[in-house]
Amino acid sequence: RVYVYVLGKEEDYSDEARQHLHTLQQLADEETCLLLSAPQSDADWQLLQKRLLASSVVIDAMLGTGFHGSLRQPLASIVAEVNAAAAAGAVTVIAVDMPTGVNSDTGAVSNGDVDEDGPLFADMTVTFGALKRGLVLYPGRACAGHIEVDPIGMPGPLLMQLEEDPAYLLQESDIAEIVVPRSPDSHKGTHGTIAIVTGSSQMAGAALMAAHGAVRSGAGKV
């Protein structure tokens, strides 16, 4: 059985969203698919908790790419209930496009802290068209889980043309030709020497990060 909680008000829907809602209403047969509204009474909330704990998978399609700020009720409480069920090991949570409570552009989260009852924590996020910045920027990245991109027929080159401020996520394949594997008979003088001038004895963090980065990138001596 599938429980579908419809949290919005139909009068607030766009024409397209209203058509999808009517299709869903036609599919709901009260046996295998049951449509429900947002919990109101204590009994409703208790029933939601029981249904979450009895479910194998929870699909989060509450909010999408337009979220910013903080979650409002009843979404904030519903997200908290889903997170509690997931923390108990009862369910696998899959987010649609973006986990609820995560800004798709910046990775900012509801209430500004992933440790508070703000955003939803997904085990997996299926995002559409292209990867969103908020899925790879923290703290939003901590909410996304495993990320899958489904193009749903959107041509990648066209999306890049339409994007006013495109971004590119560096892949291992991008640096494969730059960072060349070492030869078995190479030595520390074979791959160049790097001198680092940075930091101070009281603030050595920048020097450490630069040195680690140079060594990991293949420098022979740092």
Task: Place the predicted regions along the sequence by residue.
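Small-residue (G/A/S/T)-rich helix-start motifs and N-terminal tracts that mark the onset
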Residues: 1-18, 124, 135-222
